[in-house]
């Protein structure tokens, strides 16, 4: 017990040190305080969100059942920073200005064949969907650290959203929408994490696979 306590004491400062200066942690590494599972079934209703050793784990509670986890608080203009370490074959995402159903500007964490990490997608915005549904699909592979933690940072600001994305501090995306395509023209919303649903026709999650998140923090921007 003493050895475990010592190990956790040594790990905790390392986790805190990964939160950038000027950012406020919104995940305490202990439980899901400040977050909630979506009350809708739009993305699924998986309860497979748990916390272990300072890491937020996402896995389907039954094969194919996805879901989203949202902050209780809504944000307007902000920058969010987090570390991600997904299993290969698992499709996830970081939602910006999300509503309860998960309609949002999405920064993709689609870690699977043909997927995108750091790309921008209009989740639930029919006016934005093209053949691939991707608004921006950057060249991310050369900046990705395989089987390791990767720092993802995203910034959204303006009534007409201007979105920037960095992967391991390398700029990937600097994009401004042509108009505000959010549902109802929303200019604020929740931050959300996604585990994608999966089926035989749309295999988006490796059975038993995980997405892992830690050091989630936000910096609210002045208007």
Question: Where does each model-flagged region fall?
Answer:
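Bacterial N-terminal signal peptides
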Residues: 7-17
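Carbohydrate-interacting regions of secretory-pathway proteins
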Residues: 19-223
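Positively charged n-region of N-terminal signal peptides that target proteins for export
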Residues: 1-5
């Amino acid at each position: 017990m003493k050895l475990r306590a010592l190990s956790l004491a040594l790990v905790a400062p390392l986790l805190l040190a990964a939160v950038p200066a000027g950012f406020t942690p919104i995940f305490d590494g202990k439980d899901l305080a400040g977050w909630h599972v979506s009350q809708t079934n739009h993305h699924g209703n998986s309860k497979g969100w748990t916390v272990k050793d300072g890491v937020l784990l996402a896995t389907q509670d039954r094969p194919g059942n996805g879901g989203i986890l949202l902050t209780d608080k809504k944000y307007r203009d902000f920058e969010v920073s987090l570390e991600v370490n997904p299993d290969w074959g698992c499709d996830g995402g970081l939602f910006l200005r999300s509503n309860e159903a998960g309609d949002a500007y999405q920064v993709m964490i689609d870690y699977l064949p043909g997927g995108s990490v750091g790309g921008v997608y209009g989740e639930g915005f029919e006016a934005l969907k093209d053949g691939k549904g991707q608004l921006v699909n950057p060249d991310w592979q050369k900046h990705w650290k395989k089987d390791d933690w990767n720092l993802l940072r995203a910034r959204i600001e303006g009534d007409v959203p201007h979105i920037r994305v960095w992967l391991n501090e390398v700029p990937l995306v600097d994009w401004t929408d042509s108009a505000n395509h959010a549902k109802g023209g929303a200019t604020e919303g929740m931050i959300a994490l996604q585990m994608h649903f999966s089926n035989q026709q749309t295999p988006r999650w490796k059975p038993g696979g995980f997405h892992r998140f830690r050091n989630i923090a936000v910096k609210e921007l002045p208007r």
